[in-house]
Amino acid sequence: MTEPVTQPALVIPQLIVGLGNPEPKYDQTRHNIGFAAVDALARAWNISLAENRKFQGQYGEGTAPGGVKIRLLKPLTYMNRSGQAIQAVTSWYKLSGESVLVIYDDLDLPLGKTRLRLSGSAGGHNGMKSAIAHLSTQNFPRLRIGIGKPKNAVNGDNSETVSHVLGKFSATETQLMSLVLQFVVECVELSLKQGVEKAMNRCNSYTVEAPKS
């Protein structure tokens, strides 16, 4: 008699976290695209975000399409301490690590590309290093949004990279990124309805194109 094949459990996010830095000077910068993604989700789902001292961030909860209860978080701890805020929410609500979806910027992906994964390393991203340290696992989903590399990047020239990630998108890039954020909402909604693994097929195979002028 053959053993029944057990299907892996669906990974459905319950807490969605966007990474960024809290000061106004960081608004609209490439490094804050995670914040922008959570703002886009909050608008799409009519969820109000408000500062929550206990959770060290801007926090809100509501219902996503399909009737899924969802929590949104923008840590206000600065990027390299993001995990503190994430852990504050997961501890309070007794959420597992794999129920947390973290959205953040990625230099290694070109503009218009996104990557959804079920687990993985921090890849040099300080916010993700903190998230992994505080959740004590790498096994949680993450959605990376491509911000591209600096045009004049020289290997080993960290100053060029820093000014790129902390710089703002050009007018043309801003148009493209608004479309990317719409696509991010689509990918996250698919994750909530069908699980992260199913959503990966859509999210990882599509490139958002700049609007034709």
Curated annotation (Swiss-Prot):
Gene3D superfamilies: Peptidyl-tRNA hydrolase (3.40.50.1470). Keywords: Cytoplasm, Hydrolase, RNA-binding, tRNA-binding. InterPro entries: Pept_tRNA_hydro, Pept_tRNA_hydro_CS, Pept_tRNA_hydro_sf. TRNA binds at residues 26, 78, 80, 126. SUPFAM superfamilies: Peptidyl-tRNA hydrolase-like. It holds the Pfam family Pept_tRNA_hydro. Its EC number is 3.1.1.29. It is found in: Cytoplasm. One of its GO terms (molecular function) is peptidyl-tRNA hydrolase activity. It catalyses: an N-acyl-L-alpha-aminoacyl-tRNA + H2O = an N-acyl-L-amino acid + a tRNA + H(+). The active site is at residue 31. GO terms for biological process: protein quality control for misfolded or incompletely synthesized proteins; rescue of stalled ribosome. It comes from the Bacteria. The record marks 105 as: Stabilizes the basic form of H active site to accept a proton. Monomer. This is Peptidyl-tRNA hydrolase. It comes from Trichormus variabilis (strain ATCC 29413 / PCC 7937).
